Every structure is written in C-alpha cells, then in structure tokens.
Design a protein with these regions (language model features):
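N-terminal catalytic cores of NTP/NDP-binding nucleotidyl/phosphoryl-transfer enzymes
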Residues: 2-74, 78, 100-115, 120, ...
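Structured secondary-structure scaffolds
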Residues: 2-51, 106-110, 154, 160-372, ...
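A glycine-rich helix N-cap at a beta->alpha junction
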Residues: 80-95
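Cys/His-rich short segments
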Residues: 121-174
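Helix-rich, typically C-terminal accessory recognition domains appended to large enzymatic cores
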Residues: 126, 132, 338, 346-384, ...
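Beta-strand segments within the central parallel beta-sheet cores of soluble alpha/beta enzyme folds
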Residues: 290-293, 477-479, 572
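Intrinsic disorder at enzyme termini
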Residues: 476-549
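Phosphate-backbone binding interfaces of nucleic-acid-interacting proteins
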Residues: 530-652
Length: 652
C-alpha cells in the first residue's frame, strides 16, 4: 500500500444466483457498490471490490437437466455467455477488483475445510431434517412459518422434505446475535434491525440445516459421501475465500478482512445479519464491520420478478439512454435503504430534467460562451463581486454535505447536494448576464471572472458525480481542459481567482433530450413478453367424495384489504361472508396484487378451516386461487366470481 493511501477498504455485493440472466434489479445493487468503490478510490483508499456468482443448488441442477446440459455448462453459459453476468458488468462499467464463482476449485476446497472445522468444534452435528422446502429460495421452513401453506419469502409452493442432514447450532448464538444487532451499528438501515430481532430472533432461532442428500450439485462433504454442503456455508464464506481464507489462491485476507460493508438486498438481510455472523463467531473470526440492506426496485408499483413478466432489461435501457444516464437514474431517484418504483416515464423525465436541462445545459452554455467571448482561453485576470463569495460558500457547503451523505451510503441525497450547486450555477448565469457583460470592454474583466466561476462550479460538480457517472465526468473534465491533478478528491477546493486559467472546448450535447412519447412506445414494443404460457402437468391425487364435502366453500365480498406491516408477502382481508360478522383472512399474495384493486371483488373462500396465527394476526380461512407457470415461473390469480352472487352463498 502506497504511503499516500488512506488505508484499505473492502466492499462486496451479494453473489448472484445464475438460474437465469440478471436484470436491472441485480444491476441496482452492483451499480451502488461500484459507486461506493469509486468514491473510496477517489478519496485515496486502496479498495478491494468483490462480486460474483452463487452457482450450486437444486434449482441449478434441475434447470440444467431441463436444458439437457450439465450444471457446470448451465452456469458457464449464464455467467460467461453472451449477455451473461460478466457481459452485463462490463456494459454497466462495473469496476470490480475480483470476481468469485462458487464453482472455482479453490473455493470448493476451502468450503470443505471450513465445514470440517465447524464439525470438529461441535457446532455442526448430524441429524435428520423433516419439514417444508422451497426450491426457488433454497430455504427450509417449519409448518408454522408458512404463509397460506406457501413459502413466506416468495409465496411459492413448498414441498415436503425429509432427509439425513448436518445442522449448524445457530440457536447457540442467538443472544450474541441479538446483542450485536441491538447494540451496535452492524446492520443498517436501523429498520432492518427491528425486522430481524422481532421476526426471527425473539420467536426463537432454530438450528440450521447445512447439508443436503437429495441432490448432488454442490460442494461434497468430503468425510461423509452423499452429503453436499448447503448454500449457507458455501455462499456466505465467499467473502473470505476470495481473499485467501483456507486457500493459497490469494493472500490479502489480512489486509482486507473484516469487510467494511456488505451491500445486500433486503430479502437476504437475514442470512447476512444472523447466519453469517453466527458462523464467524463459531470459528472465532472477526465480523464484517457493516451489513447494509437496500430496498427492492419495483416496476410500476409491483415487485420486479420474472414470474410477472415485468423485469427490466438493462441492455435495452443502456442502448437507448446510455450507461451513465441509467446509473445516475438508479442512484439519484431511489433512496438506497428504501424500495423504489421504477417506471420508464420516471427514467426519461429524470434524464431530461436533471441531465439534459440542468447539468448538460450548464456545461453547454458555459463552454459555448467561453468559446464565443474568449475563444476558449480564460486567462489570468478578472473582477470579483460579492455574488461570487456566495457561490463559493455554497460550493464548500455542498462538498461537505456530499461527503457526509456518501459515507452514509445515501447516494440520492449526495447527488441532491451536487445538483444544488449545478442549479445555483445555472441561476448565476441569469443573475450575471454574460451576454450583456460581453457588449463592453469595460465589463470584460467581470465577464472573465463569471466564466471562471462557472467552470469551477462545473469542475467540482464533475468530481462529485464521477463515482456515479465516470465517463460523463471525464467528458466534462475534457471539455473544460482540466488537468489530471484537478480531477481528484484533493482538488475539490473552490478556486476561481485571478490566477486561475482555463482552456475550454465545445462538443455535442452530453445528454440529448429524449422524446417521451416516442421512447415509451419503443420501450413497450421492445419489452413485449412472449405470449406462450406453459401449464405444468400435475400428479392427480384421488380424494373421496365425503372428504371433499367437508370443505365449506363460500362467496365472500372484499370490504377492505391492506398490507401487513413487516411482511412483504401478506395482505389482510376484511370480508363479508354473509354471517353479519366480518371475517379476517390473511393471504400471501402481495406480490401478485395491489390491495386497492381487490376491494369490492367477490372471491371464494374455504370458511371452515381452523383459525391460525400469521405475523401475530388471526386468519380464519383460505382464499382460492389458480396457479400456472409462465416461462418456468409461477403466476397466481385469485378466483373471482360474479358480483351478483351474494356474500355467504355456498359453492358446490
């Protein structure tokens, strides 16, 4: 490490599951991580930025079988093939330093050693698993954890699972994990702490299944043939094996561990804030300094998923609008710790307003006036005015606020600060009226200072946006003729005095305005899904007539429907079932429907099921729905009947 470096900084994305090509939701986390890595490099840190792919598991094995290839061939195609993971990160200008695949030989060997160490110290033991299993999530659940009999994470069907397995004594570390979460800033945003403690730790942590025998595509447990290491150990330890833990592929573990921050989606916060630190505690290893759980990127108000056919292709958006514009939109528009609602209209509007009108227009006007009035040469001299001091003070305030917000991973707020300066510089043009100053030789010195101030504001703004829009920042520096030493973090001090000189040039608009109507039509055409729907064959199971007749099917009217707090899956229905007393049913269909679109609908419910507790609320019955598969992913539709049918009518 060089003497001028501030120190080492280790940042990671989650490793992505290559069961299909990645979409803009995956790019969101990776772009944010890249922006943070670039920001820290800009500040002078020696950065290690890790990303990669989590390539084992039953879902991969099954998908490979369907495709008629080996699991290794399947993941190789998704990761290395055309428009695969590596192509996507190249397209999005992701500056990762290391890419790990859990199928890499060094990682496989390291995982076997790690598993054996935890077995030898007594924290892994052999037993039998019996319960429910969600293949898409690769998660085990108890009956009480299911939502309407389905996976509480994704809402899909689960299957019975019973097999010999090894378990990790997660329960042993419950108190230490709770203390870590409640009394440190290990997990952010703070709202995630309450979710983890109240939903997982306080109800009681159960020991964790960490091996499987029902499939073979995984890291073999070398001392017990037939078992493969399950995802928790295999995937989570990538953050350390990629630095050389339990292998000799790399040797920078001592320099970069513990990680400064893991960026992860909120759906995997539980794994990173409970399971991961418990395993590190088991081995006596330092914990990462922070886990930051960002929100989801929704599309038109709905969670982005392949099953809905609403995933957004970053290749299409980058081709039409540019990579930097897309990166900017993702981090400018959505607070990083909260869910964001992606729409094409919002994307185009943001590009037109912030980039074309504000930043692009400021650069174009400034360089054009510099060329027109001074031939691009802003030499020594000038005339100061009090308005310049106001501009300088704002620039210094913006720089301080920007640094504070970026250090807190608040990219959107940091960019807001940069655009405060950009907006003020545009106003400064209107206040100083360079076109009037240019009419007289007597006011030429004042015009020179005005142009220098504008160039300085743009230069500082370019430094601030450079982690998010690296290519655009470089283009701006080039137009202003800024030397390399004026492009770094240490050059962000405001300097537009008489001794400052600039050699500017003009060029094509950095961010051309977009025709909203034309682009929306083009995007709609490009994103049309295939119309083919595949219906999964089912295994017929006979039920005798008397058993069927025991179920009481009734028409119910939806009086109210609201999301259940602290649950991404559940909707709470208030129903008129014809009895004169409202019936409450909870259903895990939040990813398929907006609550407001169900009010007033007539549905079908089984009303004689015993009440059950879900997220601390009582659910009295079950709503009927139809499930089908489209492009290999589940879709769900509630059974809706004629509104003329009265509440309480019996269906038979």
């Amino acid at each position: 490490m060089c003497e001028t470096c501030k120190g080492n900084y280790y940042i990671t994305t989650p490793i992505y599951y290559p069961s299909a090509n990645l979409h803009i939701g995956h790019a969101y986390c990776t772009v944010a991580t890249d922006a943070m890595a670039r920001y820290k490099r800009l500040q002078g840190y020696n950065v290690k930025f890790l990303t990669g792919t989590d390539e084992h598991g039953q879902k991969i094995e099954d998908k490979a079988k369907e495709a008629g290839v080996t699991p290794q061939q399947f993941v190789d195609n998704i990761v290395l093939g055309e428009k695969g993971v590596l192509d996507l990160w190249k397209l999005m200008n992701i500056s990762y330093d290391r890419f790990i695949r859990t199928t890499d030989d060094y990682h496989v060997a390291a995982i076997q050693k790690i598993f054996k160490k935890m077995y030898d110290n007594g924290d892994i033991y052999k037993g039998e698993y019996s319960g429910k299993y969600c293949k898409p999530c690769e998660s085990f659940w108890t009956e009480s954890q299911l939502v309407d009999g389905k996976c509480p994470d994704c809402g899909r069907e689960v299957q019975d699972a019973k097999e010999e397995a090894y378990f990790f004594r997660l329960s042993k570390y419950a108190d230490r994990i709770q203390d870590l979460l409640e009394n440190t800033d290990f997990l952010e945003p703070r709202s995630r702490v309450n979710e983890m403690v109240n939903n997982f730790i306080k109800p009681g942590l159960e020991d964790l299944c960490v091996s499987r025998t029902s499939f073979t595509w995984g890291v073999p447990v070398d001392f017990d043939p037939g078992h493969v290491v399950y995802v928790w150990i295999d995937a989570l330890f990538n953050y350390m094996t990629a630095l050389g833990f339990e292998n000799d592929k790399y040797n920078d573990l001592a320099d970069f561990w513990p990680a400064d921050v893991h960026f992860v989606g909120k759906e995997i916060v539980r794994f990173h804030s409970i399971i991961w630190p418990a395993m590190l505690m088991s081995l006596g290893l330092p914990l990462p300094k922070k886990v930051y759980g960002h929100g989801w990127l929704n599309f038109n108000g709905e969670k982005m998923s392949k099953s809905r056919g609403n995933v957004v292709d970053p290749y299409i958006l980058s081709e039409r609008f540019g990579v930097d514009a897309l990166r900017f939109f993702l981090l400018r528009t959505f607070p990083f710790g909260s869910d964001g609602n992606f729409t094409n209209e919002l994307l185009i509007s943001t590009i037109n307003t912030d980039l074309a009108n504000d930043l692009g227009n400021l650069v174009s006007r400034t360089t054009a006036m510099s060329q027109k009035y001074f031939g691009g040469d802003l030499g020594v001299g000038g005339e100061h005015a009090p308005l310049d001091d106001e501009l300088k003070a704002l620039a210094e305030e913006v720089m301080a606020n920007y640094e504070k917000q970026m250090d807190a991973f608040q990219f959107s707020v940091g960019l807001n600060e940069a655009f405060r300066l950009i907006s003020r510089a545009n106003k400064y043009i209107d206040e100083t009226t360079p076109w009037i100053l240019a009419k007289s030789e007597d006011t030429k010195p004042r015009l020179l200072t005005v142009m220098k101030n504008l160039c300085e504001c743009i230069r500082i703004a370019a430094i601030l946006v450079s982690p998010i829009m690296p290519d655009s920042a470089k283009a701006i520096f080039d137009l202003l003729g800024v030397p390399e030493e004026g492009r770094g973090w240490n050059a962000r001090c405001y300097c537009a005095d008489k001794d400052a000189v600039w050699k500017t040039s003009t060029g094509a608009p950095l961010f051309p305005r977009i025709d909203m109507e034309k682009e929306l039509a083009a995007l709609e055409e490009l994103s049309k899904p295939a119309s083919t729907i595949e219906i999964e064959p089912y295994a017929e199971e006979k039920v005798d007539f008397d058993t069927f007749c025991k179920s009481d099917f009734r028409a119910v009217k939806v009086k109210a429907c609201v999301p259940v707090k602290k649950s991404d899956k559940l909707l709470q229905f208030t129903l008129d079932d014809g009895t004169g007393t409202d019936r409450q049913i909870l259903s895990g269909i939040a990813k398929f429907y907006k609550p407001e679109e169900l009010v007033g609908k007539t549905l079908v419910a089984i009303t004689n099921l015993p009440p059950r507790k879900m997220m601390g609320r009582e659910s009295c019955g079950m709503l009927l729905s139809a499930v089908h598969t489209e492009k290999g992913e589940e879709k769900l539709n509630l059974i809706m009947i004629d509104d003329a049918i009265p509440a309480g009518a019996k269906l038979c």
